[in-house]
Swiss-Prot record:
Domain of life (superkingdom): Bacteria
Record-level GO BP terms: regulation of carbohydrate metabolic process
InterPro entries on file: HPr(Ser)_kin/Pase, Hpr_kin/Pase_C, Hpr_kin/Pase_Hpr_N, P-loop_NTPase, Ser_kin/Pase_Hpr-like_N_sf
Spans annotated as Important for the catalytic mechanism of both phosphorylation and dephosphorylation: 209-218
Native species: Methylibium petroleiphilum (strain ATCC BAA-1232 / LMG 22953 / PM1)
Subunit structure comment from the entry: Homohexamer.
Cofactor: Mg(2+)
Active-site residues from the entry: 146, 167, 185, 252
Binding residue positions for Mg(2+): 168, 210
Protein name: HPr kinase/phosphorylase
Family annotation (SUPFAM superfamilies): HprK N-terminal domain-like, PEP carboxykinase-like
Protein keywords: ATP-binding, Kinase, Magnesium, Metal-binding, Multifunctional enzyme, Nucleotide-binding, Serine/threonine-protein kinase, Transferase
Length: 318
C-alpha cells in the first residue's frame, strides 16, 4: 500500500530551505491535499507535478516565465478568463517560479479560493525536479520484508531465509569484510519507479544488528561511518535454505535465472544452501559478482550451454 495524502503545509515545510519559497496566498486551508483518486491513478510523480496545464488540473501547477507571459500579455478580459480557469480547476498548489512576480489577479483569486500559492526565485525546471523526487518517494508503493539488507560490492542485496539460519551472523561477517549494512530484521522497501526498488531502515533500528547470544550491536559505533548506508537500490535477493530444502525444491543448475516479485518488480534471486563447513560470506560475494555480470549482459551458464551445444554438434572436440 502507499499513502494517498500530503498537505500543502507539509510540502511547503519540506522544501522551505531548498527552494527558498514564500507562501503568498491561500493560508486559510494549509491542510489542503492532493486529490486521492489522482494519486492512486498516477503512474509516476510526473503525473502529479508539471507546468501549467488545464487538462491535468489535479497536479501541482508550475507557473514559469512563459506561463506568466501567457497569463498577462493579453487584454484584461482574457487575463481574467485564463486565471479564473486555473482557480476553477482547484489544483492542490500553484507555484510561481523563474523569479516571476505573480499577477495580482492570480494572488487575489487564490486567496479567495483558498488555493495555496507559493512563490520562489528558483527555476521552474528545478522546482519540478525537486517536487517530483519528493512526491515519488512520498507516494511510492511500499512494503516491509524480513531479512538483512546490505551494500555488497555496490549492489543492494537482501538476505532472506527461515529464522535460525544465521542471516544476521552472515551480515556481521560481510560487514567485517568491508561491506555495508542498510537494515537488519525489518527492511522498508519502496517502489520509486516502475522498475526500481529502494530499501531503507526504519528509524527505530537504524545502524543496529541483532546477533543471537550477543544482542544488539551498533554497527556504526563499532565499525565506523563507512560500515552503514542510508539506503540502496534492491538488485538481488539471496535466499538461505536448509540443505534438504535445497535438494527437494530447487534445481542444482537452474536453466533460467530465478526472480522474485517485490511490489510487482522482478528482482534477481540466488538460493544458497546452509550446511556445516560452507563459507556463506564467500558464496554470497560470488553470487553478487555473478549478478553484476548478468546485469552487464554476461550469463556464464548460457555461455556454458552454448559451448556444450557446439561440442555436441561435433564442431569442437569434447
Amino acid at each position: 500500500m502507499k499513502p494517498t495524502v500530503i498537505s500543502a503545509e507539509a510540502l511547503f515545510e519540506a522544501h522551505r530551505t531548498a527552494l527558498r519559497w514564500e507562501w503568498l496566498a491561500g493560508h486559510a486551508h494549509p491542510e489542503r491535499r492532493f486529490d486521492e483518486v489522482a494519486v492512486r491513478d498516477a503512474q509516476s510523480a510526473a503525473d502529479l507535478v508539471g507546468y501549467l496545464n488545464y487538462i491535468h488540473p489535479y497536479r501541482v501547477q508550475i507557473v514559469g516565465r512563459r506561463e506568466v507571459r501567457y497569463l498577462v500579455d493579453v487584454p484584461p478580459e482574457d487575463q481574467e478568463r485564463r486565471i479564473s480557469r486555473i482557480v476553477t480547476l482547484e489544483p492542490p498548489v500553484v507555484i510561481v517560479a523563474d523569479q516571476q512576480t505573480p499577477p495580482d489577479r492570480l494572488v487575489a483569486m487564490c486567496e479567495r479560493a483558498d488555493i495555496p500559492l507559493f512563490v520562489t526565485e528558483e527555476s521552474a525546471g528545478h522546482v519540478i525536479d525537486v517536487l517530483r523526487a519528493h512526491l515519488s518517494q512520498h507516494f511510492a508503493d511500499r512494503t516491509t520484508r524480513h531479512g538483512v539488507f546490505m551494500d555488497i560490492l555496490g549492489l543492494g542485496v537482501l538476505l532472506t531465509g527461515e529464522s535460525g539460519l544465521g542471516k544476521s551472523e552472515l551480515g556481521l561477517e560481510l560487514i567485517s569484510r568491508g561491506h555495508g549494512l542498510v537494515a537488519d530484521d525489518a527492511v522498508d522497501l519502496y517502489r520509486v519507479s516502475q522498475t526500481a526498488l529502494e530499501g531503507r531502515c526504519p528509524d527505530l533500528l537504524l545502524n543496529l544488528l541483532e546477533v543471537r547470544g550477543i544482542g544488539l550491536l551498533d554497527i556504526k559505533a563499532i565499525f565506523g561511518e563507512t560500515a552503514v548506508r542510508r539506503k540502496m537500490r534492491l538488485k538481488l535477493i539471496v535466499h538461505l535454505v536448509r540443505k534438504e530444502t535445497m535438494e527437494r525444491d530447487f534445481e542444482r543448475l537452474p536453466y533460467e535465472p530465478l526472480y522474485e516479485d517485490v511490489l510487482d518488480v522482478p528482482v534477481l534471486k540466488a538460493v544458497i544452501a546452509v550446511d556445516a563447513g560452507r563459507n556463506l560470506a564467500v558464496l554470497v560475494e560470488a553470487a553478487v559478482r555473478n549478478t553484476i555480470l548478468k546485469l552487464r549482459g554476461i550469463d556464464t551458464y548460457q555461455e556454458f550451454i552454448a559451448r556444450h551445444r557446439i561440442a555436441m554438434e561435433g564442431d569442437e572436440p569434447i
